Structures are given as structure tokens and as C-alpha cells.
Design a protein with these regions (language model features):
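Hydrophobic alpha-helical membrane-insertion signals
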Residues: 1-25
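A short glycine-rich, His/Asp/Glu-containing loop-to-beta-strand
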Residues: 16-71, 142-187
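Catalytic micro-motifs at enzyme active sites that drive phosphoryl/nucleotidyl and oxygen chemistry
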Residues: 54-56, 81-83, 104-109
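Short, conserved beta-strand element in jelly-roll/cupin
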Residues: 60-75, 120-124, 175-181, 193-207
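Short acidic-glycine-tyrosine-enriched beta hairpin
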Residues: 78-96, 185, 190-191, 196-199, ...
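Generic beta-strand structural signal
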Residues: 85, 91-93, 103, 115-117, ...
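Ligand-binding loop in jelly-roll beta-barrel domains
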Residues: 98-127
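Long amphipathic alpha-helical segments that form oligomerization/scaffold cores
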Residues: 123-150
Length: 219
């Protein structure tokens, strides 16, 4: 196994988007403008409905892929291709915008906690004018690797015998939701062709190696 060094540690920047949704932005700021192929990474989450109730009314995208992963709460998606979807805890929405799409993401709740992530991925130039596509992945489709000290939900890529449902994309993405017991280790052979990041949702992390970018997020 080849170790790779941690190149940067970044604290997310407080921001807002859509119709006043409060969030924490890690990529797409003055600290990290771009981490190829990642254009933006946002964490949205609050128990105060005023922080999210405005949602993300209809707006355009072009030439990127957006990946939304819900931890709790519910969002409704609707776009100009006619696709609709309702996301709940554990669900993933993967959207290829290609030549252009208009979509909205609105909370399907008026109280309670809403928490999730959205990642923007740059599309290669030769795919930027492709037909847009919306992919909804139910939490039940996710395979999970479990052992005595860790639980790994595989959204994309493969860990052990668990393989993610996200396939057929411009790169071979690897996207894990990892839960570790205290003072335990997580080891993974990352392809040399990939840039990477780790986002810490809770607790702290010690590392001896490298990940090309780590974000409180470790980039």
C-alpha cells in the first residue's frame, strides 16, 4: 500500500445559497477554489426550519454532475426533463447536467432536522453537451460493509464485497460513508489516478499518511 500525504486541512466557510439556505462550503471558496474534478462541496443541516425552508427554487446547471446525499430529512427534486424524486435519509441523487438543465430542490418538511451534502463535479469537455440525466438511488440499494470496528456504506466504488450502485459515469467515482469505532483504523487503496478528500462529520481524525486534500474536511 502506498501512502499519500495530507496536503491541506480546511475549515468550511459559512455561506448561504438558494432562497437563503444556510450551509457550510468546503470547496468553492477562497480557501479552495477547485480540487479537480470537484467544483464545490456543501454541507447543509439545521433543526431550525428558517435555515432551510426556502430551499433551492428552479435554477440552471450546465456541464457538471451534482451529487446530493441525505443524512436526515426530506427533499423533493423536479427538473426540466420531467424527472421527479423525493429524497429521504440515506438516499442519493446523482444528476448529470450535460448541455443544460433547470431543476429545483425543495424541503418536503416544515419542521425537524434536515442534514445532507451536495458535491459538484466538473464534466470532461467532450461530455458537457450530452443529454441531461437524473438518477435517484434509494438507501435500500446501498450495500454496506460491516465488521467489528467499522461500518462503510458504499455509494460508489467498491470496498470488500460491497459495491456501490453508482456506475457508468465519466470517471470511476469512489464515495463512502464511513463510521469507525474510537481509536480504530480505516485503510483503503486509492487509485493513483484519483484526487481525494475526507470530510469529518463528527469527532476527530488522526492520520499517518496522505490524502490529496483533507477537509474538516481534510483535503
Amino acid at each position: 500500500m502506498k501512502n499519500i500525504e495530507v496536503s491541506k486541512i480546511v475549515e468550511p466557510v459559512t455561506a448561504s445559497d438558494g432562497a437563503g439556505v444556510k450551509l457550510k462550503r468546503s470547496i468553492g471558496t477562497h480557501l479552495i477554489d477547485y480540487h479537480d474534478p470537484f467544483l464545490m462541496l456543501d454541507e447543509f443541516g439545521s433543526e431550525n426550519k428558517d435555515d432551510y425552508i426556502g430551499g433551492f427554487p428552479p435554477h440552471p446547471h450546465r456541464g457538471i454532475e451534482t451529487v446530493t446525499y441525505m443524512l436526515c430529512g426530506e427533499f423533493e427534486h423536479e427538473d426540466s426533463t420531467g424527472a421527479k424524486g423525493r429524497m429521504s435519509a440515506g438516499d442519493v441523487q446523482w444528476m448529470k447536467t450535460g448541455g443544460g438543465i433547470i431543476h429545483s430542490e425543495m424541503p418536503a418538511m416544515t419542521e425537524g432536522k434536515l442534514h445532507g451534502f451536495q458535491l459538484w463535479i466538473n464534466m470532461p469537455a467532450k461530455y458537457k453537451m450530452n443529454k441531461p440525466e437524473y438518477i435517484y438511488i434509494d438507501a435500500k440499494e446501498m450495500q454496506i460493509h460491516k465488521d467489528d470496528d467499522k461500518k462503510i456504506k458504499v455509494i460508489a466504488g467498491k470496498f470488500g464485497e460491497a459495491e456501490g450502485p453508482v456506475k457508468g459515469h465519466n470517471v470511476e467515482p469512489i464515495y463512502f460513508d464511513v463510521e469507525l469505532e474510537k481509536n480504530k483504523e480505516f485503510n483503503f487503496d486509492l487509485p493513483s489516478t484519483h484526487n481525494s478528500l475526507i470530510y469529518l462529520i463528527e469527532e476527530k481524525l488522526k492520520w499517518e499518511s496522505k490524502i490529496t486534500i483533507l477537509l474538516k474536511i481534510l483535503l
